[in-house]
């Protein structure tokens, strides 16, 4: 009986894709040449960016629709995720914090960016109807995040 319980425990434990990190659980992922980890811990944009940098990466810098489509099936629909994009330097000019250059790919939800709070300066990826799209949000909001490691 004890052996069966031990085997059951090992099977269940090995099926879990999440690893522990200071900000909660994360899911490691490799797509092509790129490595990501998806953290389900909710935090503000600044803490998320710092966490990625401390782990040798940066917040996700989406470069194309193709990259978004490859990544989307791995994202939980109940979560939204910080990206590296913000307009903290100049309102309306969306720059990737990862590169310091204008964001190479923007896929806004209908009506976005709208700066609805008056402080929407950072960009999240969220499920808008049937696909993940971008939304501007106050940087101190707490959402999950995606780090890119290379």
Swiss-Prot record:
Residues 1-20 form the signal peptide. Disulfide bonds join 52-147, 122-139. It comes from the Eukaryota. It is found in: Secreted. It holds the Pfam family Lectin_C. Coiled coil: none annotated. Residues 31-148 form the C-type lectin domain. Glycans are attached at residues 107, 115. This is C-type lectin 37Db. It comes from Drosophila melanogaster. The lineage of its organism: Eukaryota, Metazoa, Ecdysozoa, Arthropoda, Hexapoda.
């Amino acid at each position: 009986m004890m052996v069966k319980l031990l085997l059951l425990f090992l099977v269940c434990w090995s099926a879990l894709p999440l690893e522990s990190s200071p900000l909660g659980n994360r899911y490691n992922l490799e797509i092509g040449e790129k490595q990501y980890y998806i953290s389900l811990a909710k935090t503000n944009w600044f803490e998320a960016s710092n966490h990625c940098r401390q782990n040798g990466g940066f917040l996700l810098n989406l470069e194309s629709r193709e990259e978004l489509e490859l990544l989307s099936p791995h994202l939980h629909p109940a979560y939204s995720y910080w990206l590296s994009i913000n307009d903290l330097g100049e309102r309306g000019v969306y720059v990737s914090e990862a590169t310091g250059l204008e964001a190479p790919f923007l896929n806004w939800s209908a009506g976005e960016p709208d700066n609805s709070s008056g402080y929407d300066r950072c960009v999240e990826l969220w499920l808008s109807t049937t696909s993940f799209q971008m939304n501007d949000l106050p940087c101190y909001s707490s959402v999950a995040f995606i780090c890119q490691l290379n």
